[in-house]
Amino acid sequence: MAVSYKKLLDLLIDRDMKKKDLEAAAGINHYTMNKMSRDENVTTEVLGKICAALNCKVEDIVDFLPDNDE
């Protein structure tokens, strides 16, 4: 199953935040943020930190997409 973090990037724009601001607020590193920018998987711990920093739910920042072969 593929993931998309477009919702997260849209939320950052809506809140006038830069990725670097989120990295600091959530305590995540630049490498992790880059993975998310490329729609690569990250741990649930990272998602939890981001949700806590942004005061949101996981479904507010990530979409789970079906694989092409399904």
Predicted regions: what they are:
Residues N55-E70:
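Short C-terminal boundary/hinge segments that cap the last helix of small helical domains
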